[in-house]
């Protein structure tokens, strides 16, 4: 009986509220997006995606989303320049 009362004290956790605190290393972003490290390096430079870290690049969730949007656009046939532009516009539209 005491167990049920303790469980009743808990509320559901919305992980989406905490995603802004999550950061991923380069290799993790590559696995998540399904791209190579060489691609990610190139895209990061071309799209000027901000990263943290000195020895290893660290990507916040905004950067990860940008990478995944670029990947999605490339998978749909856009060249890299157009994919970067599409990702930027998509993110800008969300915040208007």
Regions found by a protein language model. Give the residues of each.
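Short, Lys/Arg-rich nucleic-acid/phosphate-binding segment
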Residues: 53-58
């Amino acid at each position: 009986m005491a167990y049920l009362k303790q469980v009743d004290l808990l509320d559901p956790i919305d992980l989406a509220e905490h995603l802004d605190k999550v950061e991923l290393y380069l290799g993790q972003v590559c696995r998540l997006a399904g791209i190579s490290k060489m691609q990610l390096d190139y895209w990061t430079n071309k799209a000027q995606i901000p990263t943290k870290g000195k020895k290893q690049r660290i990507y916040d969730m905004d950067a990860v989303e940008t990478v995944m949007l670029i990947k999605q656009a490339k998978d749909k046939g856009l060249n890299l320049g157009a994919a970067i532009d599409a990702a930027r516009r998509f993110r800008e539209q969300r915040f208007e």
